Curated annotation (Swiss-Prot):
GO biological process: cell division; protein import
Subunit structure: The Tol-Pal system is composed of five core proteins: the inner membrane proteins TolA, TolQ and TolR, the periplasmic protein TolB and the outer membrane protein Pal. They form a network linking the inner and outer membranes and the peptidoglycan layer.
A GO term from the CC aspect: periplasmic space
Entry's localization field: Periplasm
Family of the protein in this entry: Belongs to the TolB family.
PANTHER family: PROTEIN TOLB (PTHR36842:SF1), PROTEIN TOLB HOMOLOG (PTHR36842)
Major localization class: periplasm
Classification via HAMAP family: TolB
UniProt cross-references to InterPro entries, sorted A to Z: 6-blade_b-propeller_TolB-like, PD40, Tol-Pal_TolB, TolB_N
Signal peptide segment: 1-29
Native source organism of the sequence: Ralstonia nicotianae (strain ATCC BAA-1114 / GMI1000) (Ralstonia solanacearum)
Name assigned to this protein: Tol-Pal system protein TolB
Keyword list, A-Z: Cell cycle, Cell division, Periplasm, Signal
UniProt superkingdom: Bacteria
Length: 432
C-alpha cells in the first residue's frame, strides 16, 4: 500500500496438481461474496441439475450458477429442480417460454476415483447447440471443473474469456497472526501458503500462476521472497540493505522489479527471478516505488514524488531511454498504486480525493479518467486476467474487506471474512 511506503510455463495438469498440494494447511477463514451491484443488461440462463450430480460430493451446477451471477452479466432462470442430461437435446421451446435465452444440461458419471462431467450449452432462440465439454476430474478437482464450465459458458455467450477458474491471493490477519492465502476466484477453497507473526504485504503472481512473490517482515525488515506454490519451497530474491519492497513480475516471468532503498532513497531495480543480476532502473532524488510492468514488458509504470507529490510515471525498461520517465497521471494531486490492464489500454490506480482514497481507471489512449467506487479507503488494485474486473482492498461498515468492480463500474462484489481483516489482494493469471 502506497500510503505505508511514504511512511517507511506449466500446463493445466500442473495447475491441477497445484490445487492439490499448494497448502501447508487449509484456511479456516473463507471469504464470503456479497453482490453490491449488477450490470444493467443480464443474460437469462437456465442451468438444469446434471444427471448423476446428486451422487457426488460437490454441487457443480450451484457453483456454475453462482459464478455467472457474480459476473453481473447473467440472471438465473429457476429450473425448479429439473434434472436434464447432456443428451438427447432438451425441449428448448419449453425453456425459452420460461424466459431462458440459453440452457445447459449435463451428466456426471463416476469411474473409480474419477468423475466424467459432460455438459452442453444451447441457444433457445435459435434452437441449436453452442457446444460443450467433457471433463475428467478427481474428487478434489470438482470445484475447478465447475469454474471451467462457467468459463466456457461465459466465453460462448459474452465473447470474453472467463476468469472463474483463476485464483486470488490475499493476506488475512486474525489477532497477531498473518496468513498469505490462496483461494478460488469466488473466495472459496482457501489454502494457507504462509503463516507469520510479522506482516506480509504485496503478493504478486508469476505469469504462469505457479509462484507468488511477496514481502515479509519476519526478519524484522522487509525482504522479498518468491514462494513456489507447487513445491511449497520459497527463496529470498531481494534482501538488500534497507527496505526491499513492491515486487512485480515481468510478463515473461524471467525478471522481477522491486523497490529498494539500498543506496539511500527508494528507487526501482530489477532482478532475475532467482534473485541474481541486480540492475538499477531509476536514478532520481525522489522516492520511486510500486513498479508495474506493461503487458509487453517494454515499460514499467511506477509511483514517484519527483514532482512534489506522488504521481504515476512510465519508463522504458530497455534501450538508451531505459529509466527515462514520463508522467502519466495529471488529474488529482495524489495518485499511487499503478496497475495496467492485460490489454494495455487501462491504468488502474488509487487517487486521494479530499481525505478519501478511491479507485480510478485512466484510458491510456486519451487520458480520460473514471472513478469506480463509492468507498473511501481503497488500496492495492489488481486486474482480473481478462481485464474486465479490478480486485482491491477497502473498508465497508468498519470492516476491512476485498471488493471487485467491473471496469465500467456497474458490477460490484464484496468479499469479506467473518472474523479478522483481509488486505493485499492480487488476482491470479489464466490457467495455462
Amino acid at each position: 500500500m502506497m500510503r505505508n511506503v511514504w511512511k517507511s510455463g506449466l500446463r493445466r495438469s500442473a495447475w491441477i496438481g497445484l490445487l492439490m498440494v499448494l497448502c501447508v494447511g487449509v484456511a479456516r477463514a473463507q471469504l464470503y461474496v456479497e453482490i453490491a451491484g449488477a450490470g444493467s443488461s443480464q443474460y437469462p440462463i437456465a442451468i438444469a441439475n446434471f444427471q448423476g450430480e446428486s451422487q457426488i460430493p460437490q454441487d457443480i451446477t450451484a457453483i456454475v450458477r453462482a459464478d455467472l451471477v457474480h459476473s453481473g452479466r447473467f440472471s438465473n432462470v429457476d429450473v425448479a429442480g429439473a434434472v436434464v442430461p447432456d443428451s438427447p437435446a432438451p425441449d428448448l421451446g419449453a425453456w425459452k417460454s420460461r424466459g431462458a435465452a440459453a440452457f445447459v444440461g449435463g451428466t456426471v458419471t463416476r469411474n473409480g476415483d474419477r468423475y466424467e462431467i459432460r455438459f452442453r450449452l444451447y441457444d433457445t432462440a435459435k434452437g441449436e447447440s453452442l457446444g460443450g465439454l467433457a471433463l475428467t476430474r478427481g474428487e478434489g478437482q470438482l470445484r475447478l471443473a465447475a469454474h471451467e464450465i462457467a468459463d466456457y459458458i461465459y466465453q460462448k455467450l459474452i465473447g470474453d474469456r472467463g476468469v472463474f477458474a483463476t485464483r486470488l491471493s490475499y493476506v488475512s490477519k486474525v489477532g497477531r497472526r498473518y496468513q498469505l492465502q490462496i483461494s478460488d476466484s469466488d473466495g472459496a477453497n482457501p489454502q494457507v501458503a504462509l503463516t507469520s507473526n510479522e506482516p506480509i504485504i504485496s503478493p504478486a503472481w508469476s505469469p504462469d500462476g505457479t509462484k507468488v512473490a511477496y514481502v515479509s517482515f519476519e526478519s524484522r525488515k522487509p525482504v522479498v521472497y518468491v514462494h513456489d506454490l507447487i513445491s511449497g519451497r520459497r527463496a529470498v530474491i531481494s534482501n538488500q540493505k534497507g527496505n526491499n519492497s513492491a515486487p512485480a513480475w515481468s510478463p515473461d516471468g524471467r525478471r522481477v522489479a522491486v523497490a529498494l532503498s539500498r543506496d539511500g532513497n527508494t528507487q526501482i531495480y530489477q532482478v532475475n527471478a532467482d534473485g541474481s543480476g541486480l540492475r538499477r532502473l531509476t536514478r532520481s532524488s525522489a522516492i520511486d516505488t510500486e513498479p508495474s510492468f506493461s503487458p509487453d514488458g517494454r515499460s514499467i509504470y511506477f509511483t514517484s514524488d519527483r514532482g512534489g507529490a506522488p504521481q504515476i510515471y512510465r519508463m522504458p525498461t530497455e534501450g538508451e531511454d531505459a529509466g527515462s520517465a514520463q508522467r502519466v497521471t495529471f488529474k488529482g494531486g495524489y495518485n499511487t498504486s499503478p496497475r495496467v490492464s492485460p490489454d494495455g489500454k487501462l491504468l488502474a490506480y488509487i487517487s486521494r480525493v479530499g481525505g478519501a482514497f478511491k479507485l480510478y481507471v485512466q484510458d491510456l489512449s486519451n487520458g480520460d479518467v473514471t472513478g469506480l467506487t463509492d468507498t473511501s479507503y481503497d488500496e492495492s488494485p489488481s486486474f482480473a486476467a481478462n481485464g474486465k474486473f479490478i480486485l482491491y482492498a477497502t473498508r465497508v461498515g468498519g470492516r476491512s474487506v476485498l471488493a471487485a468492480v467491473s471496469t465500467d463500474g456497474r458490477t460490484r462484489q464484496i468479499l469479506s471474512l467473518q472474523a479478522g481483516t483481509v488486505r493485499e489482494p492480487a488476482w491470479g493469471p489464466f490457467m495455462q
